[in-house]
From Swiss-Prot:
Keywords: Actin capping, Actin-binding, Cytoplasm, Cytoskeleton, Phosphoprotein
Function: F-actin-capping proteins bind in a Ca(2+)-independent manner to the fast growing ends of actin filaments (barbed end) thereby blocking the exchange of subunits at these ends. Unlike other capping proteins (such as gelsolin and severin), these proteins do not sever actin filaments. May play a role in the morphogenesis of spermatid.
Subunit organization: Component of the F-actin capping complex, composed of a heterodimer of an alpha and a beta subunit. Component of the WASH complex, composed of F-actin-capping protein subunit alpha (CAPZA1, CAPZA2 or CAPZA3), F-actin-capping protein subunit beta (CAPZB), WASHC1, WASHC2, WASHC3, WASHC4 and WASHC5.
Name this protein carries in UniProt: F-actin-capping protein subunit alpha-3
Gene3D superfamilies in the cross-refs: F-actin capping protein, alpha subunit, F-actin capping protein, beta subunit
Length: 299
């Protein structure tokens, strides 16, 4: 269906749906391609802002504020397309298309035991990320739900290389409640890769986890949490590598490339050549016969 026959609302839905499906690192490319098709700058700008805000939350887009990394997620959304950073105590809007911070405002935070624990966990997690990720980023947020305090830790690393025709993202999220003796950690690890040289191949792998941690003091909890994340992510990485190796050796080879059959029969090349001559240079009365012979030969 041509886009010209769609109403404005239908166009908005189509544009939004296509933009939110853009793989990590390819949002701007998808937006530019759609601009060539839509040719409506005002419509594309509005949809790009909305979809870009969702894209940032979905893939934990990293920023740098005052030299400190900030990960955007739905946990630090304030509304009206604004995000909040606990480290810098700033709220802002982020334009993904222009890669710019806008409308920056300062905010105060309540300094209590949970805030101190957040900073301690952040230090322990940053040490782990620096040791295990080439260009990793992490952030620890706090949230209050029904008078209960939670800490949310996010980790992100990516490699976007459109020149080599592939993009990859690793992210994980860990949530636990601030309890005095025992707390349950809920985590999710997510990996996505997109290869688009010769073939268009998308790979998504994720795993949900639940573990318990004893709480003695804040320093012990922070170190135990960092060790838990390291242990679970190492296991996940080893399992993913094993599965991808098996996939490349067996499934992909069978799906994307079919081996030539071994027939162990003699081929009558002379007959094939004569049949091809009939097809390529048909004479009166031989056209129908030649088509059937060629079809049988191909099958």
């Amino acid at each position: 269906m041509s886009l010209s026959v769609l109403s404005r609302k239908e166009k908005e839905k189509v544009i939004h749906r296509l933009l939110v499906q853009a793989p990590p690192g390819e949002f701007v490319n998808a937006f530019d391609d759609l601009c060539l098709l839509i040719r409506d700058e005002k419509l594309m700008h509005h949809q790009g802002e909305c979809a870009g805000h969702q894209h940032c939350q979905k893939y934990c887009v990293p920023l740098c504020i005052d030299g400190n990394p900030v990960l955007l997620s739905h946990h630090n959304v304030m509304g009206d397309f604004r995000f909040f950073d606990y480290q810098s105590k700033l709220s802002f809007r982020f334009d993904l298309l222009q890669n710019q911070l806008r409308d920056i405002q300062s905010h105060g935070i309540i300094r209590n035991e949970t805030e101190y624990l957040r900073s301690v966990v952040m230090c322990a997690l940053k040490l782990y990320v620096n040791d295990h990720y080439p260009n990793g980023n992490c952030n620890v947020l706090r949230k209050t739900v029904k008078s209960k305090e939670f800490l949310i830790a996010c980790i992100e690393d990516h490699s976007y290389d459109n020149g080599e025709c592939w993009n990859g993202l690793w992210k994980s999220k860990w949530i636990f409640q601030v309890n005095p003796f025992l707390t349950q950690v809920t985590g999710r690890i997510f990996v996505q890769a997109h290869f688009f040289r010769c073939v268009n191949l998308h790979i998504e792998v994720s795993k949900d986890l639940k573990e318990s941690l004893e709480v003695v003091n804040q320093a012990q909890l922070a170190l135990s949490f960092a060790r838990l994340v390291e242990e679970q992510e190492n296991k996940f990485q080893a399992a993913v590598i094993e599965e991808l190796q098996e996939l490349s050796n067996e499934a992909l080879r069978k799906i994307l490339r079919r081996d030539l059959p071994v027939t162990r029969t003699l081929i009558d090349w002379q007959r094939i050549l004569s049949d091809l001559n009939l097809v390529m240079y048909p004479k009166l009365g031989y056209v129908i016969y030649s088509r059937s012979v060629l079809c049988n030969w191909i099958i």
